[in-house]
Amino acid sequence: MNGDDAFARRPTVGAQIPEKIQKAFDDIAKYFSKEEWEKMKASEKIFYVYMKRKYEAMTKLGFKATLPPFMCNKRAEDFQGNDLDNDPNRGNQVERPQMTFGRLQGISPKIMPKKPAEEGNDSEEVPEASGPQNDGKELCPPGKPTTSEKIHERSGPKRGEHAWTHRLRERKQLVIYEEISDPEEDDE
């Protein structure tokens, strides 16, 4: 089994909590008062452990993730003079796109619509590259569609169409169907 699933298994009453889980709980406990922590169920504690792990994983990947709400209070206390002055990564941070926990799965590039051609110019401009490889040659001839245009031509069904409509094809040969009678009907 996966080691991260250790939190999902609930320890039996009187059993010792494994050291790994206890350490994770201790990391989270510092964000809550003692009364809040003792009132919390084990499932809530596990939820906060996973939330903190997600936040740390996203920041390691370079995303500027929103700080989980339970961590905001502690971060505000740190800002008043504790750890932020001694943080070695503080000056080395690079501006990255801001992500929230739920949006990580739905990452997709935004496609901007093409601007309409000006009235006086009917032909589309083709980008040119200069350099030793191309020497001013056109990247794509004006008559042929680009790869992105081909993709957009073959894209899936439009809104309102049935999902399988674009996959249906006509038969090349005519098929003749015969009606088959049931043997029970013939007996009567």
Swiss-Prot record:
List the residue ranges of the region (Disordered).
76-188
Q: Where in the cell is it found?
A: Nucleus
Site feature Breakpoint for translocation to form the SSXT-SSX2 fusion protein (rare), where: P68, P69
Q: Which segments carry the region annotation Interaction with SSX2IP? A: 1-80
Residues under site feature: Breakpoint for translocation to form the SSXT-SSX2 fusion protein:
K110, I111
Region feature (Interaction with RAB3IP)? 25-80
User: In what ranges is there compositional bias, type Basic and acidic residues?
Assistant: 147-164
Expression (tissue specificity) = Expressed at high level in the testis. Expressed at low level in thyroid. Not detected in tonsil, colon, lung, spleen, prostate, kidney, striated and smooth muscles. Detected in rhabdomyosarcoma and fibrosarcoma cell lines. Not detected in mesenchymal and epithelial cell lines.
Q: Could you state one GO biological process linked to this protein?
A: regulation of DNA-templated transcription
Compositionally biased spans, kind Acidic residues: 179-188
Domain (KRAB-related) ranges: 20-83
Phosphoserine, modified sites: S108, S123
Q: Which UniProt keywords apply?
A: Chromosomal rearrangement, Nucleus, Phosphoprotein, Proto-oncogene, Transcription, Transcription regulation
Give any Gene Ontology cellular component.
nucleus
Q: What does this protein do?
A: Could act as a modulator of transcription.
| Illness | A chromosomal aberration involving SSX2 may be a cause of synovial sarcoma. Translocation t(X;18)(p11.2;q11.2). The translocation is specifically found in more than 80% of synovial sarcoma. The fusion products SSXT-SSX1 or SSXT-SSX2 are probably responsible for transforming activity. Heterogeneity in the position of the breakpoint can occur (low frequency).
Similarity field: Belongs to the SSX family.
Q: How does it assemble?
A: Interacts via its N-terminal region with RAB3IP and SSX2IP.
Q: What is this protein called?
A: Protein SSX2
Q: Per the UniProt entry, what species is this protein from, by scientific name?
A: Homo sapiens
What lineage is this protein's organism placed in? Eukaryota, Metazoa, Chordata, Craniata, Vertebrata
Name the gene for this chain: SSX2
